[in-house]
Design a protein with these regions (language model features):
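Sec-dependent bacterial lipoprotein signal peptides
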Residues: 1-22
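Short loop/turn and low-complexity linker motifs enriched in small/turn-promoting residues
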Residues: 19-138, 144, 157-197
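Short, acidic, Ser/Thr-enriched surface-loop or helix-capping motifs
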Residues: 147
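Active-site nucleophile-His-acid catalytic modules used for acyl/amide transfer and hydrolysis
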Residues: 154
């Protein structure tokens, strides 16, 4: 009887935590002034609300390499938490709808949207690190984007057997129903500093 009274609260807590994590991500809408004449918007995807791609505004590859390029370690992991997708009102895409509806426990994407100055270069610094007692996996890459006035972009970090990538697509204005298609956006990859992993 003692074992049951001890195990019952533990089992109940585990069951409730599973219900909590199976919920869809919350969309938090932020009121941010936006002028399509001289600004652009970015939706940057991450994991479990954590930034896998860091945006460095008003920066070229050269400026980034001097300051930010050397110090960047990002370990992802830890216990799952409530996921919030931060929106400034960008149009929906197939990817954003999929992320909004995701209820994954082991792996779940999230995003944050930003209003940025148009015509000024920024650097998208993507990194992912995992560490166990037997191995360390790290991959880092960076790319420069000069957002154009009134344009919307999506940014995603991806990994494969050959390395990693920061992919940038433009959200096209012609909607297909409620969803907007995307197309490739021009970026320039930054050389990695020698002191970076």
């Amino acid at each position: 009887m003692k074992k049951i009274s001890v195990l019952l609260p533990i089992c109940a807590a585990l069951a409730l935590s599973g219900c909590f994590m199976s919920q869809k991500s919350q969309i938090v809408r932020r009121e941010v002034p936006y002028n399509a004449q001289n600004q652009a918007r970015l939706r940057i995807y991450g994991q479990y609300g954590r930034d896998v791609v860091r945006m460095i505004p008003n920066s070229t590859c050269e400026q980034w390499a001097e300051k930010q390029g050397r110090r960047h370690t990002r370990f992802t992991g830890g216990p799952p938490r409530r996921i919030r997708n931060l929106s400034v009102g960008m149009p929906a895409t197939q990817r954003s709808n999929t992320v909004n509806a995701d209820t994954g426990v082991v792996f779940r994407e999230s995003y944050k949207e930003f209003v940025v100055p148009a015509g000024k270069a920024l650097v998208l610094d993507g990194a992912f690190s995992t560490e166990t007692t037997s191995q360390v996996n790290r991959c880092r890459t960076a790319a420069s984007l000069t957002p154009q006035p009134g344009k919307d972009y999506e940014v995603q970090y991806s990994r494969s057997g050959e390395g990693c990538d920061v992919a940038v697509v433009e959200i096209l204005p012609q909607a297909e129903g409620d969803l907007h298609p995307t197309g490739p956006a021009p970026i320039q990859y930054c050389p990695m500093p020698a002191t970076s992993y």
